[in-house]
């Protein structure tokens, strides 16, 4: 009997959220979208068994890979074809300083089939380094991509949406079914491109205040904002910045979230 948890001699580890990509059409589509170039500083998060690593290395001379699984990191270091091209960082991507890989005049580009159990906190970690990054291509749960790309007035719109769109343009690339992985996940997946803005459309004076407004707002998303935000701004003050206090957090645009955060920053 074939064990679907074993692929290319490696047993998928549940605690690392491992699902290995093996469908060639999907692999080719992702690498084509990434379009690696020699001058790029390319970084792969969670290379696993090398499904994306190998075709990317066909197009560039050096690739940084960040892999937490000791066995997989060892396989990559000893890979007969790739070992001279790979710089293996055996590390937790959640704690990794991606900005240290940035080089003047060379685009820092990050990609990966992210473990679904850490994808949201990892995206928040990377957003903090966004000024160093040119773009990111990630395989994620389809529902996470829908949240990243959502607009106001939808159930998918939330804190992750607002904070990601504050830092990045969000562009869904392709949808991927469970058949493309071993073991097959119980959910559909999708690839998304996150491209940090060269000049943000709206600038928060204090990012911690924007985070607070999002956290408090979406923590009580069904309440009107006159109630949700009453600890720091009144209904009258909301009207002064042209925001209807009877709206709910899920009705607010990114620009309105930034306006409320900037009001908070300047009225302490």
Swiss-Prot record:
InterPro entries: KsgA/Erm, rRNA_Ade_diMease-like_C, rRNA_Ade_Mease_Trfase_CS, rRNA_Ade_methylase_Trfase_N, rRNA_adenine_dimethylase, SAM-dependent_MTases_sf. It comes from the Bacteria. One of its GO terms (molecular function) is 16S rRNA (adenine(1518)-N(6)/adenine(1519)-N(6))-dimethyltransferase activity. Keywords: Cytoplasm, Methyltransferase, RNA-binding, rRNA processing, S-adenosyl-L-methionine, Transferase. S-adenosyl-L-methionine binds at residues 19, 21, 46, 67, 92, 113. Its EC number is 2.1.1.182. GO terms for cellular component: cytosol. It catalyses: adenosine(1518)/adenosine(1519) in 16S rRNA + 4 S-adenosyl-L-methionine = N(6)-dimethyladenosine(1518)/N(6)-dimethyladenosine(1519) in 16S rRNA + 4 S-adenosyl-L-homocysteine + 4 H(+). Its main location: cytoplasm. It is found in: Cytoplasm. The keyword rRNA processing applies. Pfam families: RrnaAD (PF00398). Gene3D superfamilies: Ribosomal RNA adenine dimethylase-like, domain 2, Vaccinia Virus protein VP39. Specifically dimethylates two adjacent adenosines (A1518 and A1519) in the loop of a conserved hairpin near the 3'-end of 16S rRNA in the 30S particle. May play a critical role in biogenesis of 30S subunits. Belongs to the class I-like SAM-binding methyltransferase superfamily. rRNA adenine N(6)-methyltransferase family. RsmA subfamily. This is Ribosomal RNA small subunit methyltransferase A. It comes from Tolumonas auensis (strain DSM 9187 / NBRC 110442 / TA 4). The lineage of its organism: Bacteria, Pseudomonadati, Pseudomonadota, Gammaproteobacteria, Aeromonadales.
